[in-house]
């Protein structure tokens, strides 16, 4: 089983990346959050991997963080949620935010995520509350991120351009250290370059 891949980003798609590891290109399915956190094409990337073996295919799912992988693995244990659905859910909500919503039985918040209806949200709360409790406690109460100013404007601009909030958050956070003294348009160009890979 493959647990981790490290290599060059050969290409990026809407929901996947091809990672060149020793001359072999691995197609790895990713959430929007993990995809946004990867460097542009040609850069070095490292992903945690879940290998899904089906009768007709072997699929690799990648994660930029241990938390996202843990939530993904918990999601696929829920009846009716397969790897693709779990990936789509994690593209619509951050792993820690999902854990907090489940821990708080926030069905209304969960139903705002594309692909989660009321019944699925209720099932997630019932089946995952204990599994995700530790992660939700580690996340703590929802808190404002430091350095709101131009980084928050960048995040909002990306959402206005059609990027999902988790994608916009990841891209804006990746540029947080570079934000000081830069104008919004400069940061927006850099964020778009990274998102398009």
Swiss-Prot record:
Keyword set for this entry?
A: Cytoplasm, DNA damage, DNA recombination, DNA repair, DNA-binding
Indicate yes or no for the key word Chloroplast.
Answer: no
| Compartmental location | Cytoplasm
**What cellular component terms from Gene Ontology apply here?**
cytoplasm; Holliday junction helicase complex; Holliday junction resolvase complex
Q: Where is this region: Domain II?
A: 65-141
User: What's an example of a GO molecular-function annotation for this chain?
Assistant: four-way junction DNA binding
Q: Where is this region: Domain I?
A: 1-64
Q: What is its main location?
A: cytoplasm
Domain comment, as recorded: Has three domains with a flexible linker between the domains II and III and assumes an 'L' shape. Domain III is highly mobile and contacts RuvB.
> How does the record describe its quaternary structure?
Homotetramer. Forms an RuvA(8)-RuvB(12)-Holliday junction (HJ) complex. HJ DNA is sandwiched between 2 RuvA tetramers; dsDNA enters through RuvA and exits via RuvB. An RuvB hexamer assembles on each DNA strand where it exits the tetramer. Each RuvB hexamer is contacted by two RuvA subunits (via domain III) on 2 adjacent RuvB subunits; this complex drives branch migration. In the full resolvosome a probable DNA-RuvA(4)-RuvB(12)-RuvC(2) complex forms which resolves the HJ.
Name under which the protein is recorded: Holliday junction branch migration complex subunit RuvA
Native organism: Anaeromyxobacter sp. (strain Fw109-5)
């Amino acid at each position: 089983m493959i647990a981790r891949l490290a290599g060059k980003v050969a290409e990026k798609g809407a929901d996947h990346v091809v990672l060149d590891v020793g001359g072999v290109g691995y197609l790895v399915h990713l959430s929007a959050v993990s995809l946004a956190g990867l460097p542009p094409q040609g850069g070095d990337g490292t992903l945690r991997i879940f290998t899904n073996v089906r009768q007709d295919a072997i699929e690799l799912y990648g994660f930029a963080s241990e938390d996202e992988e843990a939530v993904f693995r918990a999601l696929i244990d829920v009846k009716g949620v397969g790897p693709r659905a779990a990936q789509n859910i994690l593209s619509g909500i951050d792993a820690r935010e999902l854990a907090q919503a489940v821990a708080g039985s926030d069905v209304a918040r969960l139903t705002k995520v594309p692909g989660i209806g009321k019944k699925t949200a209720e099932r997630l709360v019932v089946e995952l509350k204990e599994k995700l409790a530790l992660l939700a406690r580690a996340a703590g109460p929802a808190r404002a991120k430091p350095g709101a100013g131009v980084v928050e404007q960048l995040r909002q601009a990306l959402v206005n351009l059609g990027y999902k909030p988790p994608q916009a958050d990841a891209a804006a956070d990746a540029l947080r250290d570079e934000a000081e003294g830069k104008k919004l348009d400069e940061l927006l160009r850099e964020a778009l370059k990274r998102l398009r890979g």
